[in-house]
Amino acid sequence: MKSQEITKRWIDFFVSKGHTAVPSASLVSSDPSLLFTVAGMVPFIPYLTAREEAPYNRATSVQKCIRTGDIEEVGKTARHGTFFQMCGNFSFGDYFKEDAIKFAWELLTTSVDDGGYGLPPEKLWVTVYEEDDEAEQLWLKNTGMPAERIQRMGKADNYWSTGQPGPAGPCSEIYYDRGPSYGVEGGPIADENRYVEIWNLVFMQYQIDNVRSKVDFDITGELPKKNIDTGLGMERLAMILQDVENMYETDQVRPVIDKAAALSGKEYTSAESADDPHHTDDVRMRVVADHIRSALMLIADGVTPSNEGRGYVLRRLIRRAVRSMRLLGVEKACLPDLLPASRDAMKGVYPVVETDFDRISRIAYAEEKAFLRTIASGTARLEDAVKDSKAAGQPLSGADAFALHDTYGFPIDLTLEMAEEAGLKVDEPEFRKLMLEQRQRAQADAKGKKGSHADLSAFQELLAEGETVFTGYTELAGESKVRGILSGGRKVSQASTGEEIELVLAETPFYAEAGGQAADTGLITGDGFVVEVLDVQRPVKGLSVHKAIVREGEIGADSLVQAAVDRERRHSAEQAHTGTHIVHAALHQILGPEALQRGSYNKAGYLRFDFAWGEGLSAATRSEIEEVSNLAIRNNFQVETKVMALAEAKALGAMALFGENYGNEVRVVEIDGAWSRELCGGTHVANTSLIGSLSLLGDQSVGSGNRRVEAFVGMEAFRHLAAERALVTELTEMLKVPSGLLADRIATTLTKLKTVEKELERLRKEQLTAAAAQLVGTAKDAAGVKVIAHDAGQVSGADDLRGLALDLRTRLGSEAAAVAVAGVSNDRPVILVATNEAARAAGVKAGALVRLAAGILGGGGGGKDDVAQGGGTDAAKVPAALTAVVDAITRR
């Protein structure tokens, strides 16, 4: 049975049981705590946790999901994959355990001819929570399953909760017995390779509190409305129904494996044992197939490669796939062959991968191209690092490996492999330490951004009393009432002068940071108190929280207030936000519709806009964008907002940010009608002339395939242009030319400077040659070896010392000779030793001498027997280091 038929039967069955068919949500989760939709129940969390009223009592879906926590295990087992489809049925206070069990059994065991999946009942096993006698009895009563095929497990396996206080309940899991060739008998408890879990039924019936761990919490009572949340892994069921070894060989994945095999000339053998000689290649082909499919689906849902968040996950998937193909022997670009194979396998269920394939493929191919460039440039840098490490007689440092990984995106496994080929080890502990420190910095940064919003329970309580009404679209001041005051994340009854608080009002004109627009600031005043609003956030949907400080008096938890937004700052922010829409429209007009928005930020007087584009903008293009934007401002276009259905907005061609989740009703901002039409919840000027002017600052890369433009608007644009004019005036006075001739004068000056630098370089080399001629006469005998030890003083770099040392070695002839020259470059001592063949035969080795000298200098070094280089931190020890070299040659 094909995957498309499996999902169709699922939906048809549950619709026949009174369920509403709900389309799959985006892979980009609407839950801000999740990067991706990781389970079928994620879109239904607000209903399952009673935060929102469900619009239906019963629902069913086939949900696209992404999980990358076990990405290193992909391809090695039959159970791990990054993209999967979760078939689910849900009840919100309607049916409960018995019907959930009956539905599952009926669909699984009904014959194929009668619309079911036709699984043999004797192949099915069930687990229940060890204390859930009711579930076991319902299985026995409704299915006729023998008691010996029902096994009990503990909380770790068969109990569901969010890990926070709230709803929870036992689960019951259904397993399929693949037969004795896959492992020992004895049910799921004995062997989960033989007994594959296909369906999990979660019975949400309890309220829990005092959660100490996943298995340690207090059950405080039963839920007033009991819910059902089930999930069946479509790929696992397809594996069974299609009688293949693992989920990589199902109809939606196997075509990519076949294409990878054809491109590489390798044979795919379904090897799962690490002892099988084909196992390594088979794992690589499975990784390719899995990751290509995941990348296809992520890009279809609006994710683009970047260095953080969802974009980083996508980038890693693509690069792991490309890397796996290289390990299979394919070094050319391979996505143009692999991605269409995945598209053709998935388009029956997800038509968008075909209709939007031009955009999807453009993004994927650009990322592969960039990665191949990364490998080329990274290889050159790695070869330099390997050369230096070998010269120093040291392993490749973890710092070098980290720099390659962090700066150039060079995979650590590739670094390890290439270092091994060069006969070097890599300091992996240091690399892992640096990676850990980077993660800790990122986590600390994320924690800092969350601030007191890390615990949302107090805000959830306030939200239960009603959402904050936002009045700031039409007014910037108004009366309101305090709904709650928080200090340190806890509700308090009052706050006094100097206290930093979080304030919730019944209604507010203050705009909370959202959609790239910075929050409003201003004052909240009342009877005897003044509170300054510094920031406004929405830690939970529907609740505006004012971060503030009490400047005067005492504010109470039920005070009546006057809320007043800083009008000038809001106007400047509106200039920037409307300016952002104008720049977006200008980019589309000049570059084309493929310049898709990737993100934006605007605050008083300033905007930045990120968009999909693979190369830097020329000066002429930047000027054109700036001109089109300012013409739109001068044309006094009307800016209008409309609220409409999402479908209507899309039909009108309104632009939306890919990856964002929108409700059924959206706010559309139009500039001169269709000239610019975007989904947007921000605030804007009434007409474009109120912006005044826009000054583009330039563009820069913000990750592979993405660019960023920045601009000032309004008075900030004026100040920026005034500062540039002042700079031009200063330069014209300094260079004594009119502004129109500045560029020519600067070019002429730079040409002269380069000529002077070349002359200085020539003179420096002449000085070194002259010095060598003089120094050769200073050679001393050290136990039969002619030795020159010279302190060159300040030098431009190690190359100066190398040239001098090699020149001196040549001048000393074929008799045993060694040269040690040292100097100071950028306040750090450098030493270089060179020996000739006769000296080396006499036991004088440059590498050993440099290590000795560098140790005295407070550093390290090494190299070959004929030439070696080192350095340190203590420039005052240069004479002592040179003396030590001479003494070592004498004592050898």
UniProtKB/Swiss-Prot annotation:
<keyword id="KW-0862">Zinc</keyword>
<keyword id="KW-0820">tRNA-binding</keyword>
<dbReference type="InterPro" id="IPR012947">
    <property type="entry name" value="tRNA_SAD"/>
</dbReference>
<dbReference type="Pfam" id="PF07973">
    <property type="entry name" value="tRNA_SAD"/>
</dbReference>
<dbReference type="GO" id="GO:0002161">
    <property type="term" value="F:aminoacyl-tRNA deacylase activity"/>
</dbReference>
<dbReference type="GO" id="GO:0004813">
    <property type="term" value="F:alanine-tRNA ligase activity"/>
</dbReference>
<protein>
    <recommendedName>
        <fullName>Alanine--tRNA ligase</fullName>
        <ecNumber>6.1.1.7</ecNumber>
    </recommendedName>
</protein>
<dbReference type="InterPro" id="IPR045864">
    <property type="entry name" value="aa-tRNA-synth_II/BPL/LPL"/>
</dbReference>
<dbReference type="Pfam" id="PF02272">
    <property type="entry name" value="DHHA1"/>
</dbReference>
<keyword id="KW-0547">Nucleotide-binding</keyword>
<dbReference type="GO" id="GO:0008270">
    <property type="term" value="F:zinc ion binding"/>
</dbReference>
<dbReference type="InterPro" id="IPR018165">
    <property type="entry name" value="Ala-tRNA-synth_IIc_core"/>
</dbReference>
<keyword id="KW-0067">ATP-binding</keyword>
<dbReference type="InterPro" id="IPR003156">
    <property type="entry name" value="DHHA1_dom"/>
</dbReference>
<feature type="binding site">
    <location>
        <position position="577"/>
    </location>
    <ligand>
        <name>Zn(2+)</name>
    </ligand>
</feature>
<dbReference type="InterPro" id="IPR050058">
    <property type="entry name" value="Ala-tRNA_ligase"/>
</dbReference>
<dbReference type="GO" id="GO:0005524">
    <property type="term" value="F:ATP binding"/>
</dbReference>
<feature type="binding site">
    <location>
        <position position="680"/>
    </location>
    <ligand>
        <name>Zn(2+)</name>
    </ligand>
</feature>
<dbReference type="InterPro" id="IPR018163">
    <property type="entry name" value="Thr/Ala-tRNA-synth_IIc_edit"/>
</dbReference>
<keyword id="KW-0479">Metal-binding</keyword>
<keyword id="KW-0030">Aminoacyl-tRNA synthetase</keyword>
<keyword id="KW-0648">Protein biosynthesis</keyword>
<dbReference type="InterPro" id="IPR009000">
    <property type="entry name" value="Transl_B-barrel_sf"/>
</dbReference>
<dbReference type="GO" id="GO:0005829">
    <property type="term" value="C:cytosol"/>
</dbReference>
<comment type="function">
    <text>Catalyzes the attachment of alanine to tRNA(Ala) in a two-step reaction: alanine is first activated by ATP to form Ala-AMP and then transferred to the acceptor end of tRNA(Ala). Also edits incorrectly charged Ser-tRNA(Ala) and Gly-tRNA(Ala) via its editing domain.</text>
</comment>
<comment type="similarity">
    <text>Belongs to the class-II aminoacyl-tRNA synthetase family.</text>
</comment>
<keyword id="KW-0436">Ligase</keyword>
<dbReference type="GO" id="GO:0000049">
    <property type="term" value="F:tRNA binding"/>
</dbReference>
<dbReference type="GO" id="GO:0006419">
    <property type="term" value="P:alanyl-tRNA aminoacylation"/>
</dbReference>
<keyword id="KW-0694">RNA-binding</keyword>
<feature type="binding site">
    <location>
        <position position="581"/>
    </location>
    <ligand>
        <name>Zn(2+)</name>
    </ligand>
</feature>
<dbReference type="InterPro" id="IPR018164">
    <property type="entry name" value="Ala-tRNA-synth_IIc_N"/>
</dbReference>
<feature type="binding site">
    <location>
        <position position="684"/>
    </location>
    <ligand>
        <name>Zn(2+)</name>
    </ligand>
</feature>
<dbReference type="InterPro" id="IPR023033">
    <property type="entry name" value="Ala_tRNA_ligase_euk/bac"/>
</dbReference>
<dbReference type="InterPro" id="IPR018162">
    <property type="entry name" value="Ala-tRNA-ligase_IIc_anticod-bd"/>
</dbReference>
<dbReference type="Pfam" id="PF01411">
    <property type="entry name" value="tRNA-synt_2c"/>
</dbReference>
<keyword id="KW-0963">Cytoplasm</keyword>
<dbReference type="InterPro" id="IPR002318">
    <property type="entry name" value="Ala-tRNA-lgiase_IIc"/>
</dbReference>
